[in-house]
Amino acid sequence: MKKIPFITLDKAKEIIAEIPTPFHLYDEAGIRRNARALKAAFAWNKGFKEFFAVKATPNPYILKILHEEGCGCDCATYTELLLSEAVGITGHDVIFSSNDTPALDMRKARDMGVYINLDDATYVDFLASMGPVPETVCLRYNPGGSFSLGNTIMDMPRDAKYGMTEDQMAGAITRLMKLGTKHFGVHAFLASNTTTNEYYPALAGQLFRLAVRLRNATGAHISFIDLSGGIGVDYRPEQPRCDIGVIGEGVRVKYEEILTPNDMGDVAIFTELGRFMLAPYGHLISTVIHEKHIYREYVGLDACAANLMRPAMYGAYHHITVLGKEDAILDHVYDVTGGLCENNDKFAIERSLPEIQIGDIVAIHDTGAHGFSMGYNYNGKLRSAEVLLKEDGSFQLIRRAETPEDYFATFDFSDFHFGK
């Protein structure tokens, strides 16, 4: 399927006239449309809630849009909790899923009254040492072994640092009940960026059966089951696209097959999607500033891996559109590069693209999640701006670009003078 950018060349030029490239651009209309589709897919479950994975796109304007569409926040750190709180998202609109958790983070989660998802059985006493335990606590499960769909191994939970065994969960529940906890959640994350409609239903079936066993073993009330994230996006044009309606129906079938007959038809379903919620609705907009002709043809951008780490770090594919040349013949082959002093600073390697000239504007697709958030300052590069393309066609700067003053700010105790 052809990937079409959500912005035209004319609109890009309008924004660039005020906000220089590179910048991350987000599509408000697409974000809202997708959030509503998710909600509709799970409308059969009275308690359903999406807790957006803040790590994917930690911007308060994005969190506010999602909150207006009924989403909460999935936070993993003290800072993410602060960000959520600043937007007015707190209490049971937040789930705190952390690991190797500092005391400061756990205390903040307790103070905010959020759902706390314990990664390890030893955290029961850690939590209790801070005061009365919450009435509702979630526990993260690791089944070990491999996680497969049919004959395909999707991931290896036995190698993951997250979660606890079933026996540890049962022991933690028993201990928490003695301490005063009345309701429990069950959580697991077993695969990342899946592009099959079968992942969530398969995971749901596994967690639903686990919940029944835990209820039978401990007498605990399981109030929600958290499917976490893992639904991916079609980064490549030829990849299949997940159908959230089909996924929601698949989970419903498992729910009625396993939970309802076991008198657990009141269990709420939670999700913690990040990539699925935002990735397709973000572009990294950049200007071509250089071309080089040696053993390969190179096109250099004013963006680099510090703006989008995934291609350099994972070898990940991100589609590239040269704005204004969407229908041009792809008769040139380029490496598309950034300016870091690292040879892996390449957005594309031997990619077929239309002929490119210096000054062309490119849109790098699917950067709405794990794009800006994974940025860094290597080589003294400064993080880019973030811009929201609003539903009415206007645009808003929602994070300014870093300046050299920002970069040097943490040296404020020193005797050095940093000029502009």
Spans of model-derived segments:
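A charged N-terminal "starter" segment
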Residues: 1-116, 121-129, 133-135, 170, ...
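Conserved, mostly hydrophobic/aromatic
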Residues: 31, 55, 77, 109, ...
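Flexible loop/turn segments at secondary-structure boundaries
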Residues: 58-61, 83, 125, 146-147, ...
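Structured core elements
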Residues: 72, 95, 117, 138-140, ...
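Glycine-rich, aromatic-flanked loop segments that form ligand/cofactor-binding clefts
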Residues: 132-146
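Active-site loop/helix belt of alpha/beta enzymes
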Residues: 143-289
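Charged (often Lys/Glu-rich) extended helix/loop segments that serve as interaction or gating elements
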Residues: 264-420
